[in-house]
Amino acid sequence: SFAIGLAIALITALIRISTRGGFFKVIKVIFRFYVWLFRSTPLLVQLFIVYFGLPYLKISGIAPEGIKLDPLTAGIITFSLNTGAYCSETIRAAILSIPNGQWEAAYSLGMTKTKALRRIILPQALRVSLPPLANSFISLVKDTSLAASITIVEMFEVSQQIAAENYQPLIMYCLVALLYAVACTILSWLQGYLEKITSRYVMTSH
């Protein structure tokens, strides 16, 4: 879900920073609405709408019986769209933080806007956005526990089943909390390691 969400985020960010006019302005409004919607509503509600609500959305000729998704597909779609909305703002802010002089230098070398974005701007924006993107990934790992609400079998769902069988909910939930804490601690360490590598690369490149 995070990889799909990042792809959505990059596309959304690039569309929103585009200065093209005409019909493209309508597309920008649509993507702005998408970001606003998913950033302004709870993730759990989004899961319920996609899994429980879409079956009631009957579209003549396309989905006359509603859009029915299995739990895993509904979870992937929801988490991806939610991640895309949040990360798009991170990437957009990172791109806009790059000084205009970088664009001008790229143009002076004969680069097109697309080539300048790919070779000059995005690599720098990636370094700037790495910490918040890593935090978004860690948050996503913790948010996967919400998938149990639509019957996706994940760690929290399994712990609920075991707790119901042995009548030891406190032990099971504490164990799940510990596992999440260990996983997030490891991810936080990896985040710091990647930040050191990228910082070292920038220092040596200068």
Q: Model segments located where?
A:
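Transmembrane alpha-helices and adjacent helix-loop boundaries
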Residues: 1-206
